[in-house]
Amino acid sequence: MSEQQVHSVTVELAGRPLTIEAGRVAQLANGAVLVRYGDTVLLAAVTASAEPRDGIDFFPLTVDYEEKMYAAGKIPGSFFKREGRPTETAILTSRLTDRPLRPLFPKGYYNDVQVSITTLSTDQVNDPGPLAIIGASAALVISDIPFAAPVGAVQMGHIDGVFAVNPVMGLMENSRLDLVVAGTSEAVMMVEASAYELTEAEMLEAVKRGHEAMQAVIQAQLELAEKCGKPKKEFVAPVVDTSLQDEIKAWMGNRFLQALNNSDKAAREAATDSLRTDVLEQFSAGVAEEELAARVKAVTKNYDALVKDEVRASILEQGIRVDGRKVNEIRPIAVDVGVLPRVHGSGLFTRGQTQVLTVATLGSPGDEQRLDDLGIETTRHYMHHYNFPAFSTGEARPSRGPRRRDIGHGKLAERALVPVLPEKDKFPYTMRLVSEVLASNGSSSMASVCGSSLALMDAGVPIKAPVAGVAMGLITGKEAGQFSVLTDIQGLEDALGDMDFKVAGTTAGITALQMDIKTTGITYEIMQQAFEQARQGRVFILDKMNEIINTARNDISQFAPRIITLQIDPSKIGALIGPGGKTIRSIIEQTGAQIDVEDDGRVFVTTPDADGARMAQSLIEGLTREAKVGEIFTGKVVRIMPYGAFVNVLPGKDGMVHVSELDEKRVENVEDVVKIGDELTVMVIDVEPGTGKLSLSRRAILTGETAEQRKSSSSKGGPRGGGGGGDRGPRPGGDRGPRPEGDRGPRPEGDRPREGGDRGPRPGNGGNDRRGGGFRG
C-alpha cells in the first residue's frame, strides 16, 4: 500500500463544523471518506465493477446504510450479541441516500456500483441521515467512478415559527416540520418531509432555504476532489441505432396509437406486448443467427423508445394522456368503509385501477412498538404497514416478506397521518394500520394514505381532520422551460416521466411530502406548480372521501378492547405492582384485563368487556387511593384483638377500630360487639402521617359526631364508663397479655398518688420505659 496521505476539508454548517476526510481509511475502495459533524462520525465507501453487467437495461446501484450499536456505546440485545438485519431506520436512510445520487450517473452506465455507509459514532445530537447523503456523494466525487456533480443535504425544521437548518435532535420534537432536502449546486434533487399542516408556500420556502444552506457542503466536496480526487474512468454510453425507429413506426401505422391509448392497464399492456412481438418478428426475419440477439435488442430498444416518445409528445403537445385524461385530471374514485365485519376499522379506496384496502386494529398501550437502535430508546403507538403482493400488478412471483420499497411506502403513509392523530393522553390506544394493495396502476402509496384516513375514522379514532394523498408527475421537453405537471400519475407515466412528487395532507396543509426525479434537477417554478396542482387534487379527493365519511364514528368498534385511564400517585406504583409483581398479576387473573403502568402514575386498563374494566378499576383504586379523614366505609371485620377490631375498608387496606370507638358505652370484650366476618360501618377519624395507618370509629356513626370531634375527644381523655373517650390506645406489639397469677402484686412503698405527680416506676420495668411505648399521657 502506498504511503498514507490524509486530506480533509471543514465547513461550518448551522453553526457547527462539518469535516470530510479522505485517505485515512478504506484505501482499497474506489473512494472513501469519513464525515464528522459534532461527535457523529460516518464512513462512506464506494466501489464499482470493472465491467458492465450483461443482459440488463437498468443501472445496478446498491446503497447500504448500516447502524453499528457500538456507535452509541451499546451492545446488541439479540442472542448472538451482534447486529442483525437492517433496522427500519437503516432501510429508510439507504433509500434516502439512493434517490438523489441515482440520476447523476451517466445514462447507459450498467456497471455494478455499491455505496456502503456505516455509522461509527453518534452523539444523539446530530442526525446521521443527511450526513449519509453527504458522505456517499463525497466518496463518489473523489472516486474514479463516473458521477456528474456533488450532492449536498440538510435537515430543515420549523421551530417556534422560525425555519432552522440542521436543528439538534432534541429540538425536532417540537418542530412543525422534518424535511430532508438534497441537491446539486444548481437544482434540488430530492425532498422528503413530514409536517404539521404546513402550507405549500411554507414548504417551498423551507426547500429553498435548505438548498441555500447546502451550498457550502457542495463546495467543500469540490475542494476535496481537487486535493485528492482520482481521474474519472472514461465512459462512453452505448450507441443505440435509432435508424429503425422511422421504419418501425411506419410499419405499425395506426396499430401503435390504438394499442397505446387505452385507459385499461391490462388491455393496453396486452396490446402493446402483442404489437412488440409482431415488430420483432417483422424486423428480425432473415437475420443471421449470430446477429439475431443484437438485432432483437436493437428492435426492442427502438420500440420502447417510440412508446416513450409518443406518450411524452402527446402530453406536451396536446395535453392528453394515454388514458384520455387532461394533465390535471384525477381518475375515477370509489370510497367505502366498514367493509370487513370483525375488524376494528376498514377502508377501501379505489382510484382508477389502483385499489388499496386498509385495516385498522386498536390495541393496548402495552402493544406499542419498542424501538432500540442508535437513537434514544422510544416507543411507537401508531404503525402503518404496506403490503404489495404480486397479484396487484398481475405478476406471478414468490412473496419473501416486505421489501425496501414496501417499508418506504409504509413509512410515508405513516408520516402522513401522524400529525392528525389524537393526543395519547386522550386516546391511549396503540394503532396498527395495514394497507393491502389489491391492484396497482400507480400511486399506491398515496392510496394507502387515503385508505388509512378512512380506516381510522371507521375505527372511531378521533383524528383532527381527514387526510388524502396524490402523486404528481412531470414531463419535460427538449426546449428550455417546456414542461407539463401531471396530476395523479399512473404506472406508465411514472415509468416514462421525469418526476414522482407525492403530497399528502388535509385541507389546511401538507402532512407528508416525497419527491424523486430522474433528471439532473427541477426548478422552483416546476415545484411551485406541482404544489398547487397537488393541493387542488388533494381537496378534490377529500371531497369524495367526505361524501362517505368525514369524521370519526361516535364510538370504537364493539370488537375493539376498552381502555380506562387512571391516575395514581407515583409513590403507589409499588403497592399496585406488589412484591415480584404478585399484586398486579392477581388483578390481571381476576379481571382478564391487561394493565400497563407508566412512570408518571398513569395506569391503562385494557379489557375486552366493561365488567372486567370496572372490576379492575375498583381494585386498582382501592390499592392506590388514600382514605381521607371523615370518609365513611362499610367493610368486613378481618381481625380481632383485645384492644380493638381491624376492618377492611379498601382493597388491601385495613384500619383499626379501637375498643373505645366500638360503641357508645364502655366495651369490656371486643367480641361482645363484633366478630370476624361481620360488616361494620365506620368513619376514618385519623390517618397517621408517614405510615398511612387508619384509625376508625364506629362510635362516630352511632353518635353522629364528626371525625374531628371523635379525635379531639379521644385525645383529651374522659370518663372510663358511660362512653367517655380518652383510652390509652393499643400498645405496640399487641396486648400485654395476662398478668402473672392473675394479680399485679403489691404496690411498692405505699399507695400511688391520686392527684398529680408521677405514678412512679412500675416494678421490673426500668422507670419510664414501657416496652417501646413512651408515656400514657
Curated annotation (Swiss-Prot):
EC number: 2.7.7.8
Compartment(s): Cytoplasm
Keyword Iron-sulfur: no
InterPro entries: ExoRNase_PH_dom1 (IPR001247), ExoRNase_PH_dom2 (IPR015847), ExoRNase_PH_dom2_sf (IPR036345), KH_dom (IPR004087), KH_dom_type_1 (IPR004088), KH_dom_type_1_sf (IPR036612), NA-bd_OB-fold (IPR012340), PNPase (IPR012162)
Biological process according to GO: mRNA catabolic process; RNA processing
Keyword check for Transit peptide: no
Comp. bias intervals (Gly residues): 718-727
All copies of domain S1 motif, residue ranges: 630-699
Annotated catalysed reactions: RNA(n+1) + phosphate = RNA(n) + a ribonucleoside 5'-diphosphate
Entries under SUPFAM superfamilies matching the protein: Eukaryotic type KH-domain (KH-domain type I) (SSF54791), Nucleic acid-binding proteins (SSF50249), Polynucleotide phosphorylase/guanosine pentaphosphate synthase (PNPase/GPSI), domain 3 (SSF46915), Ribonuclease PH domain 2-like (SSF55666), Ribosomal protein S5 domain 2-like (SSF54211)
Taxonomy, superkingdom: Bacteria
Cofactor (UniProt): Mg(2+)
Molecular functions (GO terms): 3'-5'-RNA exonuclease activity; magnesium ion binding; polyribonucleotide nucleotidyltransferase activity; RNA binding
Keyword annotations from UniProtKB, A to Z: Cytoplasm, Magnesium, Metal-binding, Nucleotidyltransferase, RNA-binding, Transferase
UniProt-annotated binding residues for Mg(2+): D494, D500
Region (Disordered): 703-777
Cellular component per GO, a single term: cytosol
Enzyme class: transferase
Protein family per UniProt: Belongs to the polyribonucleotide nucleotidyltransferase family.
Entry function: Involved in mRNA degradation. Catalyzes the phosphorolysis of single-stranded polyribonucleotides processively in the 3'- to 5'-direction.
Name used for this protein in its record: Polyribonucleotide nucleotidyltransferase
